[in-house]
């Protein structure tokens, strides 16, 4: 499991006084001659509900060998959750009250390096959950509602609940620039990938598939 350097929930991304460029670096200039990069933005299209697969040459320790589910993609920027970094912190340790009602929840997941004290939830529900963010069909991201009520009112299969601390974020144009540079591949998301029972090998499996796709073109 991915270690979060001890006291996970005490980590912060930047001092409160940090300006926007510290948290969201300015995007690199876009090279419009990079046809492969632009094709990457379109097939599948960069949008909410796709997966970002870290390229082999992405060495940023926050994102190296990560799989990220894009939960928001708007003119204000992009937000996502890292899917394949379970921590060594149990839900019982981080959220003892929730654990009383949901004792089967095991480990907290590292969602990304921004706002690591914030908690959010991914879950599968066959019924619409009003007021939540539907990422793809039957998959919901919850970070504003009361987690207790959502979990207690709706009977959720324990295989399809993940709790995350922190998230990943990009300023407008920043992720597009990183895609064109080759830092990421885009892949279609589905329930089996989002709630993969072996997150430790998820990147290895997906990087083989995405690179094979490019080689075959």
Please name every model-derived segment.
Residues 4-12:
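Sec-dependent N-terminal signal peptides
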Residues 13-17:
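C-terminal segment of classical bacterial N-terminal signal peptides
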């Amino acid at each position: 499991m991915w270690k979060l350097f001890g006291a996970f929930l005490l980590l912060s991304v930047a001092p409160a006084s940090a300006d926007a460029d510290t948290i969201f670096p300015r995007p690199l200039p876009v090279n419009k001659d990079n046809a492969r990069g632009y094709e990457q933005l379109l097939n599948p299209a960069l949008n909410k509900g796709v997966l970002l697969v870290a390229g082999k040459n992405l060495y940023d320790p926050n994102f190296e060998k990560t799989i990220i589910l894009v939960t928001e993609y708007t003119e204000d920027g992009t937000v996502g959750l890292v899917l394949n970094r379970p921590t060594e912190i149990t839900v019982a340790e981080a959220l003892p009250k929730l654990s009383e009602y949901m004792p089967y929840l095991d480990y907290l997941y590292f969602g990304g390096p921004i706002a690591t004290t914030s908690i959010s939830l991914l879950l599968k529900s066959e019924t619409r959950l009003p007021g939540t963010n539907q990422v793809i069909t039957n998959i919901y991201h919850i970070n504003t509602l009361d987690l207790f009520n959502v979990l207690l009112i709706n009977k959720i299969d324990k295989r399809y609940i993940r709790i995350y601390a922190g998230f990943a974020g990009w300023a407008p144009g920043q992720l597009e620039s990183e895609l064109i540079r080759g830092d990421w591949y885009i892949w279609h998301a589905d329930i089996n990938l989002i709630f993969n029972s072996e997150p430790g090998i998820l990147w290895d499996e997906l990087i083989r598939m995405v690179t094979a796709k490019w080689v075959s073109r």
